Amino acid sequence: MASNQGPCGGIITMEKYIIAAVADNMAIGRDNELLWHISADMKYFRMVTMGCPIIMGYKTWLSIGRPLPGRKNIVITKSHFDAPESVVQVPDVAAALAAAAIPPADAPAPEKCFITGGAKTYERTIASADKLYITHVRTSVPDADAFFPAIDPAVWYKESESSLETDPENGLQYSFAVYVRKA
């Protein structure tokens, strides 16, 4: 959990969640693009992350190309880039978590933030994440160049998983799972 000083001096804690769509071989991307388009997964991502700060690496920002509405967009980057004023640019994960914990004006501190990619950002944050929201896409992508870290069953408990569904546009099967860090 990230923490921040509250207005009365108390510590505010914020849970860190990771969200990703992952192939059976843990592939998540190729040439800085997603490997598939699954409408239900895009809707799920929007529903789960709406209203929460989202943290992403610069390459993920480039692949999206715009701020995602209804969420504080925080981009980890070593170099400042042209972006709308609403996009928060930070140099590292620690600064991203600190920025995520700052509440919007006249609002309570966020209870959670989502790490939305890419591979390097997932690698740097999985050891301290509290939950994983994983869309398991039942395919293997041998020519992928970006991968999600292994989900170690000694560390993660699968709290829930939806039934397997099939995308009507591309025939890919997928399910939504939530993993919780074991105590």
Q: What annotation goes with each model-predicted range?
A:
Residues 13-17:
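Extreme N-terminal starter segment of soluble prokaryotic enzymes
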Residues 19-183:
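Flexible, gly/pro- and Lys/Arg-enriched active-site loops
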Residues 11-12, 102:
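Short hydrophobic transmembrane-like helices used for membrane targeting/insertion
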